[in-house]
């Protein structure tokens, strides 16, 4: 932390908050599997996996993985892969954990926060578990807390979704300060490959101007590659 504090004097430090899931190798998950009091209900565990056929996720693997906890078998929620299990935000202790974590980062000079895979955060039975109102409320809370600490903070949401869904994370200027502009990379690639900028120009002209204190986070590729879903609309 001494090094981070030193760097923050001359640079704006950005942190990736992996808020949706954790590795099964993490100490938090191992404590959960061992059914320790401080980690009980930290991750989503179910006895019945029926009623989740509508769930939208960018993977074809099974949504659930079986684990034994206290000599009982449970289905654990794995949005992305079976070595990553999703946090249970219906447990207030999980939210408090992340608030404390972000506060620690703030105290040590971090001022920009990227919320990883935030769109999948909240889960409800018989829904698609994507962009749910509760997820937006968590983003609003994070924005409020950051603003209370310092006006020099930024909140960025990573939501690799169709364009209109992505833009919803600006809220009423009370959620993200910036959203990843996920439609740009595939449209730019199409333009270069086809030698035709029509689609790119049409999209750019349709984009609403960013409101005060918000912006689009433009990029041309990421570690996840270039997805096509953001071009759906």
Placement of each model-derived feature along the sequence:
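Active-site-proximal substrate-binding groove within the catalytic cores of carbohydrate-active enzymes
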Residues: 203-233
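Catalytic-core regions of glycoside hydrolase
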Residues: 198-199
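Hydrophobic residues within beta-strands of alpha/beta enzymes
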Residues: 113-115
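Acidic/aromatic-lined carbohydrate-recognition and catalytic surfaces
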Residues: 1-99, 103, 107, 118-192
């Amino acid at each position: 932390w001494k090094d981070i504090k030193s760097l923050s004097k001359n640079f704006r430090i950005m942190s990736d908050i992996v808020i949706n899931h954790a590795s099964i190798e993490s100490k938090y998950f191992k404590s959960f599997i061992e059914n320790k009091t401080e980690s009980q209900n930290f991750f989503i565990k179910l006895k019945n996996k029926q009623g989740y056929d509508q769930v939208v996720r960018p993977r074809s693997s099974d949504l659930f993985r079986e684990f034994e906890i206290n000599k009982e078998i449970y289905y654990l929620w794995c949005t992305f892969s079976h070595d990553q299990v999703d946090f249970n935000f219906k447990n207030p202790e999980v939210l408090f954990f992340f608030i404390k974590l972000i506060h620690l980062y703030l105290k040590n000079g971090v001022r920009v926060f990227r919320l990883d895979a935030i769109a999948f955060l909240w889960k409800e039975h018989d829904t698609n578990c994507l962009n749910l109102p509760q997820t937006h409320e968590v983003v609003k809370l994070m924005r409020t807390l950051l603003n209370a600490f310092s006006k020099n903070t930024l909140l960025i949401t990573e939501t690799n979704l169709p364009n209109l869904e992505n833009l919803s994370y600006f809220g009423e200027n009370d959620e993200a300060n910036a959203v990843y502009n996920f439609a740009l990379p595939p449209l730019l690639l199409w333009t270069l490959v086809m030698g035709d900028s029509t689609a790119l120009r049409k999209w750019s002209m349709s984009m609403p101007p960013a409101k005060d204190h918000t912006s689009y986070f433009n990029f041309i590729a990421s570690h996840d590659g270039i997805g096509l879903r953001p071009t759906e609309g």
